[in-house]
């Protein structure tokens, strides 16, 4: 059984036992988190939401919080001596999907 959930402005396909990286959540490590915005549940009994599946939720456990690799943003205007260099590290949360309830 799998589901498509919406979190952090993205849609993610998840299965029980899978570990996913999502946008940072305000939750403690080893704490449980519930995703109520379930768009689709697949498997033997398919349920399609319009836009959400009623009564469906996905339960997971927070494994860790972290920051992604650094990216460099560089702006430049040719021949004008304008240069701006900036780095960014996006925070994330790693979640282990425990079960899908539909």
Curated annotation (Swiss-Prot):
Gene Ontology annotations of biological process type = translation
GO MF entry, a single one: rRNA binding
Cellular compartments per GO CC: cytoplasm; ribonucleoprotein complex; ribosome
Q: Does the keyword Ribonucleoprotein apply?
A: yes
- Is rRNA-binding set as a keyword in this record? yes
Tell me the keywords, alphabetical order. Answer: Ribonucleoprotein, Ribosomal protein, RNA-binding, rRNA-binding
Give disulfide pairs as residue numbers: none
- UniProt cross-references to PANTHER family, sorted A to Z: 50S RIBOSOMAL PROTEIN L21 (PTHR21349), LARGE RIBOSOMAL SUBUNIT PROTEIN BL21M (PTHR21349:SF0)
Role: This protein binds to 23S rRNA in the presence of protein L20.
How it assembles, according to the record, is: Part of the 50S ribosomal subunit. Contacts protein L20.
* Alphabetical list of HAMAP family matching this protein: Ribosomal_bL21
Which family does the record claim for this protein? Answer: Belongs to the bacterial ribosomal protein bL21 family.
Put simply, this protein is called Large ribosomal subunit protein bL21
Which species is the source of this protein?
A: Exiguobacterium sp. (strain ATCC BAA-1283 / AT1b)
Question: Which gene is this protein's source?
Answer: rplU
